[in-house]
Regions:
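Extracellular/surface recognition and adhesion modules
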Residues: 9, 28, 43-49, 89, ...
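GD-rich hexapeptide-repeat beta-solenoids
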Residues: 16-39, 55-81, 98-115, 134-157, ...
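Short "repeat-start/strand-capping" segments in structured domains, especially the N-termini
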Residues: 44-46, 112-115, 124, 199-201, ...
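Low-complexity/repetitive intrinsically disordered segments
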Residues: 1-22, 119-129, 135-139, 165, ...
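Extracellular beta-solenoid/beta-roll
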Residues: 45, 57, 84, 108, ...
Length: 353
């Protein structure tokens, strides 16, 4: 105590005061409201514990735990449980109890079941974690995380987080819900979805539903030499299972395999993706690409494999289905090789219908 050194003590009433640990590793077993056991002593009316130095351990025996904040900031190595505020705590075993964030910006990191919260190594926490108020930051080292359909919620391999504002996926994948999700790409490997700002996103499986990607330019993708429907790459993020794409006047480019495009005026579909606000110039890329044009007229440009539709200028196109519409040549000398019924070749393009 302040003036005495007691030994052979079994029970201590701290009268709503504080307890300080040693410079070594201490263990504190919380046994009830404002009660704990440490160093063979049963303490009651404990208000605060400063665990001090060493790799200290707090065991809460299933009690709920909240991270701690003061003066507008989350405090590392600090938590609250059953009326006791712990500081300088390196390890916490919740024995199935719930972990919640503080009123300020907390940091969480997960790798499978391994969980760190405000620098505390947390074990045996319940799977549901409410990150609390503040702009909380979650770093996920799992290979995949999944949206739930509710804003600010994310399921990792072992935990279900809510009230999360910022997530670092550590170059891993994100999966959408079975319903319609929206992904706003904000920069290289970065996007916003479900009101969460994601960074270090390697790939996104938008999953089922009528999903939307908003970005400023995209390239269609292929796998093993075959173009993949509903797939694209933008800002170093590989998207799959995407139904809709808004390019905000950015460019669309084809893959290195045979892509399919269809236009009807400004309406554009590319590898089964409905594309809006694409820049007018579209390079179809490598492969024997197929373009279906529902406009009443399309026009050659004088360059091989190039065709202007009503709203787009395609290059690197090998095959065009004019859907029983018209083709117009250039102001110069063009050659048209008729190859069959309603079929011809011109400017390196095989036209049908």
């Amino acid at each position: 105590t302040a003036n005495y050194a007691f030994s052979s003590v079994e029970t201590v009433d701290l009268a709503d005061n504080a307890l300080t640990g040693t410079a070594n590793a201490d263990t504190f077993d919380v046994t009830g409201a404002n009660a704990l056991t440490s160093a063979g002593i049963n303490f009651s009316n404990v208000e605060v514990v400063n665990a001090d130095d060493g790799a200290d351990q707090v065991n809460t025996d299933g009690a709920d735990v909240s991270l701690f904040a003061e003066l507008g900031n989350a405090v590392d190595y600090a938590l609250e449980t059953l009326g006791i505020t712990f500081r300088e705590t390196e390890n916490a075993d919740l024995n199935g109890g719930t972990l919640a964030g503080s009123s300020e910006a907390d940091s969480f990191e997960v790798n499978g079941a391994a969980l760190t919260a405000n620098a505390i190594s947390v074990t045996n926490a319940a799977s549901g974690i409410n990150a609390g108020d503040g702009v909380d930051v979650l770093t996920v080292n799992d290979t995949n995380s999944t949206l739930t359909g509710i804003d600010n919620e994310l399921d990792t391999a072992n935990y279900a987080f809510s009230s999360v504002e910022t997530v670092d996926l550590a170059d891993n994948a994100l999966t959408g819900t079975a319903n319609a999700d929206t992904f706003d790409v904000t920069g290289a490997n970065a996007l916003t979805s479900a009101d969460i700002d994601f960074t270090n996103v390697a790939s996104v499986d938008a999953n089922d539903g009528d999903d939307q990607v908003n970005t400023n330019g995209a390239t269609l993708t292929s796998e093993a030499g075959i173009a993949v429907d509903n797939a694209l790459t933008t800002q170093q993020i590989a998207f799959t299972s995407v139904e809709n794409l808004d390019l905000a006047n950015g460019a669309l480019a084809g893959s290195d395999a045979a892509d399919s495009f269809e236009v009807n005026g400004v309406a554009l579909t590319a590898n089964a993706i409905s594309v809006t606000k694409a820049a007018s110039g579209i390079n179809a890329g490598d492969g024997v690409d197929v373009l279906t044009v529902n406009d009443t007229n399309s026009t050659l440009t004088g360059a091989d494999n190039a065709l202007d539709t009503a709203n787009y200028q395609f290059t690197s196109v090998e095959t065009v289905d004019l859907a029983d519409n018209a083709l117009t040549g250039t102001a110069n000398a063009d050659t048209f090789d008729v190859t069959g019924a309603n079929a011809l070749t011109s400017a390196g393009i095989n036209f049908s219908n």
